[in-house]
Amino acid sequence: MNTGEYNKLGSAIEEVSRGQLGRWECYKQRLFFLVLALLVATVLWALILSTLLSSASSKLRVLLSHQDLLRTNASEQKMTLSSLKDDIGACRNCCSVTKAQLQTTLAEFKDIQAKLMEQESILKELQERVTQDLAKASRDRENIRSELFQALEAVKRQNSSCEQCPPSWLPFQGSCYYFSETQATWDTAQSYCGGQGAHLVIVRGLNEQGFLSQHTRGRGYWLGLRAVRHLNKIQGYRWVDGASLNFSHWNSGEPNDSRGHEDCIMMLHSGLWNDAPCTNERDGWICEKRSSCY
């Protein structure tokens, strides 16, 4: 091989070496950028992981704090529950005692109630006996009074100069009775009777009631009986002489105090009694006074 060929071969080798060196430089640059990119990515990931770990650590601390708080609350709730259980137990014991006391009280109440019912029955029986005795005494008194007046009238009839009652007045058992021909209110009728030395009739028994019923002549008449009110409620009835009502001859369903102002008593044409407003001017009246000689 001559010198020229060697020169050509050296030139060729030199050209090949230069090309390889250029490619190697290119590879080195690429590798540098790749390493740099990896390094940057690693740093970024490290920063991101650090941030995430810091956030997770903060959240973990918060969660642990909440856990401690929940444990504390759970402990307190457990203590409260235990206290409530104790209170419930005490209340149950108290309820048991109260229930026993109530049962005892109820038994005592039933016993007292039974005794009261027994006493009420005895009292009712006594009242019935007293009522019967009073009714019998009233009948006996009326019979004695009737017999006495009959005897007095018999004695008076023996004296021809004795006139028992004024004209237009009817005699009965020692009293004189005037049956009016006109109508008036109860107060007007009582005033008229007072002017005659009399009063509106007081019916003391069945005999007197029978006498009055025989002379009604199909008309109604005021009696000397009025209601006694207290707080706008009728408490009873009283005659014009102040005596309480012992004998009565009421019509069916009477007295009913219709509309709350039927305070005066009148006798129907049938002889039965009825309550009516004292301002009623549709009825006559009957005056009564003791008989005397003129």
Curated annotation (Swiss-Prot):
SMART domains: CLECT (SM00034)
UniProt GO molecular function: carbohydrate derivative binding; D-mannose binding; fructose binding; polysaccharide binding; virus coreceptor activity; virus receptor activity
All ranges on the Extracellular side of the membrane: 52-294
Residue pairs linked by disulfide bridges in the UniProt entry: C264-C278
Any Gene Ontology biological process: negative regulation of T cell proliferation
Domain C-type lectin positions: 172-287
InterPro entries per record: C-type_lectin-like, C-type_lectin-like/link_sf, C-type_lectin/snaclec_domain, C-type_lectin_CS, CTDL_fold
Gene Ontology CC annotations of this record: plasma membrane
Locations listed in the record: Cell membrane
Protein name: C-type lectin domain family 4 member G
Annotated organism of origin: Mus musculus (Mouse)
